[in-house]
Amino acid sequence: EKWALVQIDRNLSTSIAMKGIEALHRNDVPFHCISVVTADAMEQPERMYRFFRDNGITNVGFNVEEQEGINTSSSMQGSAMEEKYRDFLRAFWRLSEQDGYPVVLREFEQVISLIQGNARMTQNELNRPFSILSVDWEGNFSTFDPELLSVASDRYGSFNLGNIKDLSLVESTHTEQFRRLMADMTSGVETCHKSCEYFGLCGGGNGSNKFWEHGTLASSETNACRFGTQIPTQVL
């Protein structure tokens, strides 16, 4: 009975999402799709590709299932899954190539644009302070990765820097909490720069992935960066 209810809920949410896509098409509103990819998808690249193509979804990003928050593990962990993901992306690329590239995959597009422009990244908005500002419903705010807003940890306490009602953004940069987060974030990015040949294509990774996988911002390679940057680059 519980499984039946879950299936009904999934079918309903899918139906609503497809109606939304139809409305966007009717009104010529451009959009992109972010798809969470799990182990179940690895055997179905053609099915996924045709879904996007046949529904006119031309800009797609793959978010590989991550170890994050209450998700203490991922179905995509391990070298065997990394190889399956390579095969999955190769198949997706071939299918799109055969049709004249009607579906643009974010992971490929990011790498291609950097290579074509002979450009490389030195950091990114998820490890650069206040490129992103996240505020919760009570006014508590944080920077760097939005996934860290209001998260509590043994190492850092709360990732929040203060409350927007009584602390300015400038004032928050003088707090011990900000200095500690900034020091560890900088250390992690520098380690990536020194040790990883893919650094110029990602700019030092994401703090939330480093924290959830290694317990500290002062770390480097993650499962997330292998799937998000390294493997797509290898496939190209």
Question: What is each residue range found by the language model?
Answer:
Residues E83-I115, E147-K194:
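C-terminal accessory region of radical SAM enzymes
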Residues L126-P129:
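Short, small/polar residue-rich loop motifs at catalytic or cofactor-binding pockets
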